[in-house]
Amino acid sequence: MRNPSTVVQENGSVSDFISQLGYFAFSSRFLNLNSEGCSGSSSHSLYLNGFENYRCVKRPPRSGASLSLSSRGSSSLRRFVNEFNNVIKFHCHKPPLGFASLGGVSDETNGIRDDGFGVSQDGALPLNKIEAENPKRVLILMSDTGGGHRASAEAIKAAFNEEFGNNYQVFITDLWTDHTPWPFNQLPRSYNFLVKHGTLWKMTYYVTAPKVIHQSNFAATSTFIAREVAKGLMKYRPDIIISVHPLMQHVPIRILRSKGLLNKIVFTTVVTDLSTCHPTWFHKLVTRCYCPSTEVAKRALTAGLQPSKLKVFGLPVRPSFVKPIRPKIELRKELGMDENLPAVLLMGGGEGMGPIEATAKALSKALYDENHGEPIGQVLVICGHNKKLAGRLRSIDWKVPVQVKGFVTKMEECMGACDCIITKAGPGTIAEAMIRGLPIILNDYIAGQEAGNVPYVVENGCGKFSKSPKEIANIVAKWFGPKADELLIMSQNALRLARPDAVFKIVHDLHELVKQRSFVPQYSG
């Protein structure tokens, strides 16, 4: 039986098999190439009729064409891959469908209609000649596939406001939900479904990892959503575009490149995964890629990004985490906690997911000293939007002090009131806990992007991993008792690894980048 505290390394042969499976599924089912090398489905063909100077040329049929493992089959496979890559390269350099209909602009009208909030409505691409007194416009691209992307976007927006005030206007948009047609606008809902069914998500993650798969997917997808995405991007007239999501690089960059705007708009990526991350995070044409760790920077280099485009600043978290922390006693009093007992923070994310109730009950038992008839610690539980869970926990008669909260906006105060934290391996929560010097017990992770966060925490001496509520409770009880020294050492390690000023370094570097293009005519018809 597998030890619940063991992190299983993703099997390389399994992921390779899945990648090959995904490749053949994509090439045979989506492309549906016939014997002439053309797609049998006109609606999904990568050889688009709209491009008159490029047509599918029929070739004489070849006898014995096969994808078998024989030498002839291997030759056919190599020939197919080469032809397939040529098609993808062609489509990555062609303007997306619908771009021509955006039309030109006149200098008199500037091609926009304003909605009263500084956001242009529809219209064509404006000719926006930046003046020194005009605020720069920042567009942050994210999607609600998990709470971390929005949290990073909000952190960057808050840092711009604190550091530069009215010199910057910052907009946050969910590009897929707000600016793509059905079914592409269902991305967050699809993600939530896949994550709840772990095997499906794991397969999706690894199938789309190979470059030949995700590059071709983006090229094909662009033909259907380019017009809407282009309008969605350009209505904000951005000076800077910041992507905080792995699916927000390839399609927007392709659109900007086809319009000749890549050397005029600062396009940057802020990676929000601490260690393991999907290859779609990286695109060679970004102006800058901000990495939260050296592990991610190494992956970016492997993906082909130039070292000069990389900055390792850390993960952006809310600026409120940088401010001096108030005394624990004061924070505990405000939160209704015991002012003297050591405290553990139990979290389940914004939706209050995971074994929170079972863990809280195990903590209540482990933190009660039967010999002396008194508690040795207390618990602060954050249930997020899960009101049913909060109601059940509040109805329990606990042996130790337990405070139950719903969705909280001042997480820095909750962390400041506690001595350690139990949470799943979300990168944002890990980064915030390290800033507060909280030893971390990870009780779960999402396969793929969060798998590497577990060894990142454990191997750096900042915490432990276990899926067993009973084992977790025993760890906390020892930290609050005979192993208090271990708790202190882990707290010091967390503070050493923390990067509280990451978000400010990011916005200041962005400020320097945009200053270099301050008087460049940005948008031309």
UniProtKB/Swiss-Prot annotation:
One of its GO terms (molecular function) is 1,2-diacylglycerol 3-beta-galactosyltransferase activity. Its EC number is 2.4.1.46. GO terms for cellular component: chloroplast membrane. It is found in: Plastid, Chloroplast membrane. It comes from the Eukaryota. SUPFAM superfamilies: UDP-Glycosyltransferase/glycogen phosphorylase (SSF53756). Residues 1-103 form a transit peptide. GO terms for biological process: glycolipid biosynthetic process. Transmembrane segments: none annotated. Its main location: plastid. Pfam families: Glyco_tran_28_C, MGDG_synth. It catalyses: a 1,2-diacyl-sn-glycerol + UDP-alpha-D-galactose = a 1,2-diacyl-3-O-(beta-D-galactosyl)-sn-glycerol + UDP + H(+). The keyword Plastid applies. Keywords: Chloroplast, Glycosyltransferase, Membrane, Plastid, Transferase, Transit peptide. Induction: By light and cytokinin. It is an enzyme of class 2 (transferase). Belongs to the glycosyltransferase 28 family. Involved in the synthesis of the major structural component of photosynthetic membranes. PANTHER family: MONOGALACTOSYLDIACYLGLYCEROL SYNTHASE (PTHR43025), MONOGALACTOSYLDIACYLGLYCEROL SYNTHASE 1, CHLOROPLASTIC (PTHR43025:SF3). This is Monogalactosyldiacylglycerol synthase, chloroplastic. It comes from Cucumis sativus.
